[in-house]
């Protein structure tokens, strides 16, 4: 069968080496085999790579939950409502530059799959400069606008002062948050998920210790209330970012750019163009999600503090439900990108199948106990005897199952983006959120009341999954490119085009993920 595309058909696959014979490789220092995602069995490799990502997400969620317990239990429902509103803004800000970091990560992963260290370092230098400049500009622009944005969201008056104080301090922390996330994602693109996990552990440890000290003014420290939680976030991320940079320098990491090589920080405009053309659509996906979250929060706010507090508590619980899908999707994206760079297309498709199977196994295993025991888990985030508890349980019963659908979408689009196909996932997400979720909730509230908001979650997640599977099956994502190059291999028409079937092709329990 003829290969699609302008170049030759894939070279023969050598199962002994795990890569295509005849592929030119750029010389690079010996690599730790644990960081090479182009070799080994798919299941164990995906599991080993995804496990630290899952651990990192667990740590971040536990950290957020611990902070929510301190704030909700000791500062009251208004303070918890303030955090829920401010965190939606923070998610929007993270989404604004997420795409740039993700595009850089895919470029690094593809270069490492080709064993092209020089290109990986060029990508890191250019994207670090671009990423830093954008994040600083966003933080500077956000500081004077925090109160107006919170008011536009309809933040309850009782929660507004808390949310404003918290959000202003978070804006100061944004550059540190962004740069730490960027370095972590870059290392994962190079196949190292363990190092980002260890430094994230440091972030969480510092934050857990500092939050009560600064919120309540323990010892010589001032009592800062809600602002103390944001100050703790700033200090923890700044300290861990500095530690990570020092570690990279001390280890003389292959991706570390020394002072003598600072010319690599000068923008390579071909890379900048790719970061913008590929990164903006990926960042726009996060922006669409965050805007939809803000729109949903604005609708929830209209139902009063009791419902808003219940929704905030449920969102804390749901962070754990979505972790398997997010970890698997992130692991699949890096793994697929390295294999795309290496020209190993059968491994790309096998990665998607494994990812979808593990999403169903792990997400399903979380949903069941979180329905059965939600009275106790949700009570952790609310004051004792709060009337919000039963509202929160009702929300959870309606919406928690939607994360099975969400997981399939996240995994498939993680693989799809690894080739450089970034616009179709954006279109699908836009249709699901702004064509289904928000209109569904708005249109049916007069009939269903607040239940229309909760039912919009499974409705939109199901639509997104069906569209994602259709694009995976029939879309042209295998022909996409990040940086065009003459030696790019054509995609053979023999590559399987079926969306992974978690029923017909179950994945062995070895490839767990976020």
Question: Where would I find each of the regions flagged by the language model?
Answer:
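Transmembrane helical elements of multi-pass membrane transporters/channels
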Residues: 48-67, 169, 180, 236-240, ...
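Hydrophobic/aromatic residues within transmembrane alpha-helices of membrane transport systems
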Residues: 55, 67-71, 83, 108-113, ...
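Small-residue-rich hydrophobic transmembrane alpha-helices
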Residues: 80-140, 177-196, 310-374, 406-428
